[in-house]
Amino acid sequence: MSTHKWYAIQTYAGSEMAVKRAIENLVKDNGIEEQLKEIVVPTEDVIEFKNGKEKISERSLYSGYVFALLDLNTELWHRIQSLPKVGRFIGESKKPTPLTEKDINLILEKVHNRAAPKPKISFEEGENVRITEGPFANFTAIVEEYDMVRGLLKLNVSIFGRSTPVEILYSQVEKII
């Protein structure tokens, strides 16, 4: 029977991949690869727009956490915890507590069932936005509907005092703060 259990390791936000590599290197350099079966940083793809161009990037689903299937002993626990950018193991009374099977299954399901990229910015009905491109550039509008599949916003734009419905790509608008 395997003594490996899943643990959640808290990291500095944005350092999840660096911590993953550091843990992998730690077990390799010390010849204890058998104590680490798997290490996971759940991510999702998001669509961003930089300089008017669409870019797909990865975002951590659980910012600040790495999940590792470990045969954990006190020595390995302290070595991992002393790595740069590692906060602590999640647990009670300062002792690592393994994740429940239910919890890790929910996390792994998200890893294995990656969805299509989602826009990084979301819009809500009734929200005011500014149009940044196209014939209605610099107009303000109200979001009526959002079509996530097509990446379109249905907006109401006030033109010459009349409310006019228009469909615009979400990349052509920005939130008004």
Swiss-Prot record:
One of its GO terms (biological process) is regulation of DNA-templated transcription elongation. It comes from the Bacteria. SMART domains: KOW (SM00739), NGN (SM00738). One of its GO terms (cellular component) is cytosol. Pfam families: NusG. Transmembrane segments: none annotated. Keywords: Transcription, Transcription antitermination, Transcription regulation, Transcription termination. Residues 125-150 form the KOW domain. Belongs to the NusG family. Participates in transcription elongation, termination and antitermination. HAMAP family: NusG (MF_00948). This is Transcription termination/antitermination protein NusG. It comes from Campylobacter jejuni subsp. jejuni serotype O:2 (strain ATCC 700819 / NCTC 11168).
